Amino acid sequence: MLAVNYTNLRDNMKHYMDQVTDDYETMIVTRKNNKNVVILSEE
């Protein structure tokens, strides 16, 4: 499982979206106030 902060995700969106879909990874996006989000591939 990957973990990335919101700013890094925003700056490198294509890279992380490709990594999630190509490698079937699940990604946690860390945000302020512990309002984290999980991103996963639909496939």
Describe the residue ranges of each PLM region:
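Small, basic N-terminal interaction modules of short regulatory proteins
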Residues: 1-43
